[in-house]
Amino acid sequence: MDISGILNVDKPVAWTSFQVVSLVRRLTGIRRVGHAGTLDPFATGVLLICLSQATRLSEYLMKATKVYRAEVCLGIVTDTFDVTGTPMSEADPSGVDRQQVEEALAAFVGEIEQVPPMFSALKHGG
């Protein structure tokens, strides 16, 4: 029996998107399994897993509107620009108020072009 469809998976921290796809392949026995967008290993959240015929939809799903929620630690810069890195500098963030944070976050609303950090789940050449 060939099952086609889309699974809505809550990817756990420390798992790669590829590991989730591999697990779904192993558990279902379905060969054509893919995901509609990569999440970094330390990120958790919705990972859409496409099965069989539904893999054709992944390019459209990746273009769909997405919403992100983040937890941040103000005042620390790491060598990888994320929580997995070694702290390079620290500053006291107590002088930063909610309005300043909201104003800074406003720059990330809408369509933006972001340069990915050196260490990321960016796909190169395919």
What do the PLM-derived regions correspond to, one by one?
Residues 1-125:
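Catalytic/RNA-binding core of pseudouridine synthases
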